[in-house]
UniProtKB/Swiss-Prot annotation:
Residues 315-348 are annotated as: Disordered. Its cofactor is Mn(2+); Mg(2+). This is Serine/threonine-protein phosphatase with EF-hands 1. It holds the Pfam family Metallophos. Ca(2+) 3 binds at residues 620, 622, 624, 626, 631. Binds 2 manganese ions per subunit. The lineage of its organism: Eukaryota, Metazoa, Chordata, Craniata, Vertebrata. The gene is Ppef1. Residues 335-348 have a biased composition (Basic and acidic residues). Its EC number is 3.1.3.16.
Length: 650
C-alpha cells in the first residue's frame, strides 16, 4: 500500500516537472522573441540617429562649398556668405566677468537656489534639491558658474591624469544627454563626488533630453568644488553647432528668454576649454568616441584645444594633401574649408590636429580589422581590434574606455576586453529601450559594471505593452524618414516594376529601400510593418505611404519641394539661425532666395529658381519682405493617419 502511494506521488511529481519545463521553454521562447523585437527597434532608432548626425556633419561640406565657390565668383552672394562665416567663426568677444554679470541682477523676488562663491559642498546640495523641485537657476548664477569654470578649465592640460589606489575607486559615466533623473540615480546609488569618491564624466552631457542645463550646472558646480576629483571630458555634443540641431540651444532660450544669448556666448567658449580625455594610472585611456590608426597622443597632448570651436568648421592649408584616404573614400566625405598657406588664421587648428580631435570624438569600434570611414555618422572612423592593439601598445596603455554609443545593457566589452563602451542615459530612445550603466575601477582590478534604469508609471505596464510602445515609436520615425524620400522611393520602385502593376518582389523592394535611404536595416524582417505583401510574396509598394503624409503650407506646392523642405528642415533652421545675426527670427526675401539657391546647388535638390521664387512669395505671409523662418519650417510636419494594430517583429 505504501509503495502504491509512493508511485502515485512520483507520477505526480513527474507531471509537475514536465509542466514546469513546458512553461519554462515557452517563457524562454517568449523572451527570445522580445529580444529580437527590441534588437530591431533599437537598430531603427540607432540608424536614424546616425543618419541625422551624418546630415549634421555634411553641413560642414556646405559651408566649405559656399566659401570656396561664392566669396570670389559671385558678388551678390559674397556678402551673405561672409556674414555667415563672421558669425560662426567669430572670436569670442566676451567681456570680463564683472562687466558681464553687472548687467544681470538677482531680484529679491527670486525664490530659486542662491549660490555663494567660492562654491562649497553646501552649494552642490542646494542645487540638487532645487533641481529636484524643478526650479530654475537664475541666469546670473549660470553665468557666474560658466565664468568660474572657464577660468579653472583654462589651467588644465588636454588630458587629465588620474591616480587610483586599491582603497580608492573612480567612477566613470558615459553619455547623459540631458537626462537629469539618470544623474540623480547615479548619485543616489554611488554617492556624490568628493575627494574620496572621484568621477569621470565622459562627454555628451547635453542635447536630446530636457534637462541639459541642470546637468551641466550640477557637473560644473561639482567640478569647481572638487577640481581634482571630478573630471569632465568633451564629447561631440559639447559643440555649439550640434546644440542648434539637437535641442540644448532651444532649451537655453526657453528657460532664459532675456539672457539666453549671453549664456550661449559664454558656453561656447567653455566647451572649447574642456579636456579631451582622461588617463587613469597611465594604463587606461578615457575618451568620448574612439581612435583611428593615425591617433597620436603626443599631438593631442600638445595642440591648443580651445581652437576647436566646432567640428563643422574644419580648416586646412591649401597646399596640404587631404591625404587620409579613409576620409576621401567615404560617400559622405566632408571636404574641409581651404585657406591660403600663408593666411592660416591664428584661431584655427591645423588639418591634422582637427582630424585628431574629430577621430577621438566621433569614432566607433567594430569587429572588422582595420580603420575605415564611419559612413553611418559621417565623421570619425570605424576602428578594428588590430587598430586598438596597435594604438594602446604604442602608448603603453592597456585599455580604452569610451562612450558615444547607446547599448541595450548600458555597456559593452569588445576587442578582446581592450575596449569598453559605457552609456549612462537609460531609456535613451524610448521608455524601456536600454539600461544605463557606470563603471567603478581601482588600481590593479577589473572594472565593475553597475546597471540601472529610471522607472516611470509606464514601466508598470506589462512587458509586451512596453515593447509594443517602443516598436510603434521606432516605426513612426522610420516612416517619417521614408516619406521624406517618397518621390525618390517611388522612382526606384517603378524602375523595377516593368509591368506597371504596382507590385514588385520583396527582394526588389528591400534593395530599393536600402539604396535610397542607406540605413543598413534588415528590410525583409521589417517589411510586415511597412508595406502590404500578398500571398505570393509580391509587395504593393505604394502601400508604404498609405498612413502618412507631409503637411505643407499650401496645396499647390510640388511634392519634390515639399519633401526637400521636410528632409532638410533641421539643416535649414541652423543656416537661417546663423544668417539671423540680430536674433529677430526674421530674414529678408533676398537672403532667403540666395541661401536656397546656394543650398540647392550644393545638395543637388533639383529645385529650379522659379520654384524658389514662388516659395519665397508664399512664405512671406504678411507681404512685408521678411520671412519668419521658424514659423515657416514648422509648417512642414508629418501626419500619421493610424498605426497598424496587432503586428510585431517576432
Amino acid at each position: 500500500m505504501g509503495c502504491g502511494t509512493s508511485s502515485k506521488k512520483g507520477n505526480k511529481s513527474k507531471k509537475v516537472i514536465k509542466a514546469a519545463l513546458v512553461i519554462q521553454n515557452w517563457y524562454r521562447r517568449y523572451r527570445a522573441r522580445l529580444r529580437v523585437r527590441q534588437h530591431y527597434a533599437l537598430a531603427i532608432f540607432q540608424s536614424i540617429e546616425y543618419s541625422d548626425e551624418q546630415g549634421q556633419m555634411q553641413l560642414s561640406s556646405f559651408f566649405s562649398f559656399m566659401l570656396e565657390n561664392y566669396t570670389k565668383t559671385n558678388n551678390e552672394d559674397s556678402a551673405l556668405v561672409t556674414r555667415i562665416f563672421d558669425n560662426t567663426r567669430r572670436e569670442s568677444q566676451i567681456k570680463d566677468r564683472d562687466d558681464f554679470l553687472g548687467l544681470i541682477e538677482v531680484p529679491d523676488s527670486y525664490d530659486g537656489p542662491r549660490l555663494q562663491f567660492p562654491l562649497t559642498f553646501t552649494d552642490i546640495h542646494i542645487l540638487l534639491q532645487a533641481f529636484k523641485q524643478q526650479q530654475i537657476l537664475h541666469a546670473h548664477y549660470v553665468l557666474e558658474v560658466l565664468f568660474e569654470a572657464r577660468k579653472v578649465l583654462k589651467q588644465m592640460p588636454n588630458f587629465s591624469h588620474v591616480k587610483t589606489f586599491p582603497a580608492k575607486e573612480i567612477t566613470i559615466c558615459g553619455d547623459l544627454h540631458g537626462k537629469l533623473d539618470d544623474l540623480m540615480l547615479i548619485f543616489y546609488k554611488n554617492g556624490l563626488p568628493s575627494e574620496n569618491n572621484p568621477y569621470v564624466f565622459n562627454g555628451d552631457f547635453v542635447d536630446r533630453g530636457n534637462n541639459s542645463m541642470e546637468i551641466l550646472m550640477i557637473l560644473l558646480v561639482c567640478f569647481l568644488v572638487y577640481p581634482s576629483d571630478l573630471h569632465l571630458n568633451r564629447g561631440n555634443h559639447e559643440d555649439f553647432m550640434m546644440n542648434l540641431r539637437y535641442g540644448f540651444t532651444k532649451e537655453i532660450l526657453q528657460k532664459y528668454k532675456l539672457h539666453g544669448r549671453k549664456i550661449l556666448q559664454v558656453l561656447e567658449e567653455v566647451y572649447t576649454w574642456l579636456p579631451i580625455g582622461t588617463i587613469i594610472d597611465n594604463e587606461i585611456l578615457v575618451i568620448h568616441g574612439g581612435i583611428s590608426e593615425s591617433t597620436d597622443l603626443n599631438t593631442l597632448h600638445q595642440l591648443q584645444r580651445n581652437k576647436m570651436k566646432s567640428v563643422l568648421m574644419p580648416p586646412v592649408l591649401g597646399n596640404q594633401e587631404t591625404g587620409e584616404k579613409r576620409n576621401k573614400s567615404a560617400s559622405n566625405y566632408v571636404e574641409p574649408r581651404k585657406v591660403e598657406p600663408d593666411k592660416t588664421p591664428s584661431e584655427d587648428l591645423t588639418k591634422q590636429e582637427w582630424e585628431q580631435i574629430v577621430d577621438i570624438l566621433w569614432s566607433d569600434p567594430r569587429g572588422k580589422k582595420g580603420c575605415y570611414p564611419n559612413t553611418s555618422r559621417g565623421g570619425g572612423c570605424y576602428f578594428g581590434p588590430d587598430v586598438t592593439s596597435k594604438v594602446l601598445s604604442k602608448n603603453q596603455l592597456k585599455m580604452l574606455i569610451r562612450s558615444h554609443e547607446c547599448k541595450p545593457d548600458g555597456y559593452e566589452v569588445s576587442h578582446d576586453g581592450k575596449v569598453i563602451t559605457v552609456f549612462s542615459a537609460s531609456n535613451y530612445y524610448e521608455e524601456g529601450s536600454n539600461r544605463g550603466a557606470y563603471i567603478r575601477l581601482s588600481y590593479g582590478t577589473m572594472p565593475q559594471f553597475f546597471q540601472y534604469q529610471v522607472t516611470s508609471t509606464s514601466c508598470l505596464n506589462p512587458l509586451h505593452q512596453r515593447m509594443n510602445a517602443m516598436e510603434s515609436s521606432a516605426f513612426k520615425i522610420l516612416k517619417e524618414k521614408m516619406i521624406s524620400r517618397k518621390t525618390d522611393l517611388i522612382n526606384a520602385f517603378e524602375l523595377r516594376d516593368h509591368s506597371r502593376s504596382g507590385r514588385i518582389s520583396l527582394a526588389e523592394w528591400a534593395f530599393s529601400m536600402e539604396n535610397i535611404l542607406g540605413l543598413n536595416l534588415p528590410w525583409r524582417s521589417l517589411s510586415s510593418h511597412l508595406v502590404t505583401i500578398d500571398s505570393s510574396g509580391s509587395v504593393d509598394y505604394m502601400s508604404s505611404f498609405d498612413d502618412i503624409r507631409i503637411e505643407k503650407p499650401t496645396k499647390d506646392m510640388k511634392s519634390n519641394l515639399t519633401e526637400t523642405m521636410y528632409r532638410y528642415r533641421s539643416d535649414l533652421k541652423i543656416i537661417f539661425n546663423i544668417i539671423d545675426s540680430d536674433q529677430s527670427g526674421l530674414i529678408s526675401m533676398d537672403e532667403f532666395r540666395t541661401m536656397w539657391k546656394l543650398f540647392n546647388a550644393h545638395y543637388k535638390a533639383h529645385i529650379d529658381d522659379s520654384q524658389i521664387d514662388e516659395l519665397a512669395s508664399i512664405v512671406d505671409f504678411n507681404k512685408d519682405g521678411n520671412i519668419d523662418f521658424n514659423e515657416f519650417l514648422k509648417a512642414f510636419y508629418v501626419v500619421h493617419k493610424y498605426d497598424k494594430p496587432g503586428t510585431s517583429l517576432a
